[in-house]
Amino acid sequence: MAPSNLPPVFNATSQDIEMLLAAQCHLGSKNLQVHMEPYLWKTRPDGINVINIGKTWEKIVLAARIIAAIDNPADICVISARPYGQRAVLKFAAHTGAVAIAGRFTPGSFTNYITRSFKEPRLIIVTDPRTDSQAIKEASYVNIPVIALCDTDSPTEFVDVAIPTNNKGRHAIGLVWWLLAREVLRLRGTLANRETEWDVVVDLYFYRDPEAEEAKELEEAKAPGVEEIGAAAVETGFGAEGWEAAGGSAFAAAASTTAPPNWEATGGDWATSTAPAEGWAGDAPAGETKW
């Protein structure tokens, strides 16, 4: 890892480096853009380009110092068309006071003043230069500086500050936005010093699948199944064998107390009690004509 050119106060802690590695921020793609080559550490035998984590931290601190230099936080616009970054930009905007655009970027938001979504930010931060290319292109038309989370294959045209990181994994995207928000709050003085822990956990910045969350809630709310009922019966000591034994004894007791009625004594002979059947011809009326 290359030595840091930052002052000692901005050096990354071992915990920050471990979090970046755990979130796989150092794993790029197999393609390498020529302008991202200075941030490359090495290429693995399987072709994956590994990003220098030290460079990633330096660019996070540089981007945080640029953001903190803007007086009005509402003049900062954070953008993410990629689903994995939408929750992160919303949380970043809530904690730093920026304006978030999560989802589709409306064309003309920076150039067409007639549109309802027209904005004039002083700085924009995008999650992926490829998916957020429309926002970067419009920012270049009106001279708005751009900070972007760039992978090894990301286009860097019109990007002023590139933060080299994995911008395709949900944990990597959420962690970089969380670190950026924490550094901004430290530079603004919201957090007393670098030793003060931020009470916001990084999990809040991670993408969550709505369908998976809904399925989890339904599974937790459903009634206990057959397995749970069987387990409860075993715990009480009254299992399936107990039910059979109890049922057999109950039926035996009922059979012994009540005897069946004597049909032979009361009914007599069925053959003698039944009247002889007459012929069908005799039942027909005399005046009825035959067809």
UniProtKB/Swiss-Prot annotation:
GO terms for cellular component: cytosolic small ribosomal subunit. Residues 256-291 are annotated as: Disordered. It holds the Pfam family 40S_SA_C. One of its GO terms (molecular function) is structural constituent of ribosome. It is found in: Cytoplasm. Its main location: cytoplasm. Keywords: Cytoplasm, Ribonucleoprotein, Ribosomal protein. InterPro entries: Ribosomal_uS2, Ribosomal_uS2_C, Ribosomal_uS2_CS, Ribosomal_uS2_euk, Ribosomal_uS2_euk/arc, Ribosomal_uS2_flav_dom_sf. One of its GO terms (biological process) is translation. Belongs to the universal ribosomal protein uS2 family. Required for the assembly and/or stability of the 40S ribosomal subunit. Required for the processing of the 20S rRNA-precursor to mature 18S rRNA in a late step of the maturation of 40S ribosomal subunits. Component of the small ribosomal subunit. Mature ribosomes consist of a small (40S) and a large (60S) subunit. The 40S subunit contains about 33 different proteins and 1 molecule of RNA (18S). The 60S subunit contains about 49 different proteins and 3 molecules of RNA (25S, 5.8S and 5S). Interacts with RPS21. This is Small ribosomal subunit protein uS2. The gene is RPS0.
